[in-house]
């Protein structure tokens, strides 16, 4: 959305290739469990808040799970997920979900 994807990926490829590789494997699969994880992030946020620790990190994570759940991937399953999607393809789906 901000036009920084290729520059960011180039930096990761140079400085943190293992992280980029992990992102390529994991980010496309996040929507498969996002609905469940959204609730879990709110539960953790509430626990942290009750303990007097900031809940904002996990509230933000819940927001990301909500966004992931709006992508078409969220309607797939572990058995039917399209494994050929690139990280860029998936990020485009996230951007489109923001627009909704």
Residue locations for each model-derived region?
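Short, basic/aromatic-enriched C-terminal tail that caps enzymatic domains
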Residues: 80-100
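Helical "substrate-binding/catalytic lid" subdomain
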Residues: 1-83
């Amino acid at each position: 959305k901000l036009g920084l994807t290729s520059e960011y990926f180039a930096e990761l490829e140079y400085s943190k290739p293992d992280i980029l590789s992990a992102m390529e494997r994991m980010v496309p699969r996040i929507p498969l469990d996002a609905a469940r994880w959204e609730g879990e992030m709110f539960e953790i946020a509430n626990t942290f808040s009750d303990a007097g620790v900031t809940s904002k990190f996990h509230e933000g994570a819940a927001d990301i799970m909500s966004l992931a759940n709006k992508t078409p991937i969220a309607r797939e399953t572990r058995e039917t997920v399209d494994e050929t999607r690139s990280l860029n393809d998936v990020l485009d789906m996230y951007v489109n979900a923001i627009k909704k």
